[in-house]
Amino acid sequence: MMAKKYVLALDQGTTSCRAILFDRDSNIVGVAQKEFTQIYPKPGWVEHNAEEIWSTQYGVIAEVVAKTGIKPEEIASIGITNQRETTVVWNKNTGKPVYNAIVWQCRRTTEICDELKVKGLEETFKKKTGLVVDAYFSGTKVKWILDNVPGTREMAEKGELLFGTMDTWLIWKLTGGQVHVTDYSNASRTLMYNIRELCWDEELLGYLNVPMSLLPTVKASSEVYGYTQPDQFLGHSVPIAGVAGDQQAALFGQACYEPGMAKNTYGTGCFMLMNTGDEVYESKNGLLTTIAWGLDGKVTYALEGSIFIAGAAIQWLRDGLKILESAPDSEYFASKVDGTDGVYLVPAFAGLGAPYWDMRARGAIVGLTRGTTKEHIIRAALDSLAYQTKDVLGAMEADSNIKLQALKVDGGAVANNLLMQFQADILGVPVERPQVIETTALGAAYLAGLAVGFWESKEELAKRWKLDYQFESVMAEDQRNKLYNGWEKAVGRSMDWATEE
């Protein structure tokens, strides 16, 4: 027996697959990352090829092991964290997907959502799942596949198909088709799972017309689900022992273990989660109630504000407008101006998420004058991340009656000091950036390590959280209010735009 020295985190994101090795001191020993194809068949539709995701994920596993020179048998366990809601349905006999994976950002099921709302079912879904009826969540995506891909409805009725979010798909592949499971956090994003009773909800499945036989078994976020088939994992059998959706994993990696602690992750989208312990808060302000994780025999809940477009707005400046060479350049250009000169950019490219939930909103740049420069537009795009975060924090404080003391942040954009300073200024609370900003992968590693005794307790893990920098708010309150009022006006102009004539 070789000593177990590492935990491997698989981070299956929206645009890339990553494999990150952590040692016992939670240091990153190796990282491999590879992007995969984004498929846009029609405006507002987004797909991924699930087979390509698997081969990309397997490729980075092999790469990180080769690059670091470690032996696969030194890996104590594997943790998986994933883009949530993205839906794949596959044939359980052949292992082949019946259609591309439908991505969380995809709006194709807007009409299915409208039908559910017209039938007056929104409250029922909200009460049971903690979610709003929106094209974002998995349930309507599964329904769309069964309604639109020829032959799938019959196969589903015969019990020949399986549904999974990306965690489920990867575990199924890694175990050679032996294990069909998900965890509480991912199940809570499907629109089919009752977060109070902790079971798949037959009434909701009836409304969506999805057979129970498709659904995975729901387990805790930290337990041994199964073992890798040696031929699917570099010739070795390693326990898969931790799973959480990417945002819940980041909350765990940020050591937000006490009720009232919150983090904001800046990625493709922006996601703020606040731990609410065993309280299920029903949001009056457009937030989601979700399961943070299942651990030690109990479930922890969270309030979540989901912002669809954050870093993706900067990618659009780079790829769409081509006014940036690379995303990090945004800080350089934005720092060339004192502010936006009255310009606001509302990145509602895929509708608006929390707290507005307007599927028909579209992007807008307002306040343009002849004096507007590319620097102003870049600055306005960065500022939009901070404004959207303020929208969500306001809703969170109203729902929970908890006044946030500080906001922990993570994700790629937190390296941008200008953005982080503006975030602190516009919120009026300190913004805390940790030393390890890979908190999503860290959270998955922690869950997997705890399950096999690689780490003892979450108390031990909480002590490891270290601050890199605290951004203090220096903006005067009247200035903050003036800027934010302008933002609210700009959002109003972007709403209810994409209407059918």
From Swiss-Prot:
Keywords: ATP-binding, Glycerol metabolism, Kinase, Nucleotide-binding, Transferase. Key enzyme in the regulation of glycerol uptake and metabolism. Catalyzes the phosphorylation of glycerol to yield sn-glycerol 3-phosphate. Sn-glycerol 3-phosphate binds at residues 14, 84-85, 136, 246. ATP binds at residues 14-16, 268, 311, 315, 412. CDD domains: FGGY_EcGK_like. Glycerol binds at residues 84-85, 136, 246-247. NCBIfam families: glycerol_kin (TIGR01311), PRK00047.1 (NF000756). It comes from the Bacteria. Its EC number is 2.7.1.30. It catalyses: glycerol + ATP = sn-glycerol 3-phosphate + ADP + H(+). ADP binds at residues 14, 18, 268, 311, 412, 416. GO terms for molecular function: ATP binding; glycerol kinase activity. It comes from Desulforamulus reducens (strain ATCC BAA-1160 / DSM 100696 / MI-1). One of its GO terms (cellular component) is cytosol. GO terms for biological process: glycerol catabolic process; glycerol metabolic process; glycerol-3-phosphate metabolic process. Gene3D superfamilies: 3.30.420.40. Transmembrane segments: none annotated. Belongs to the FGGY kinase family. This is Glycerol kinase.
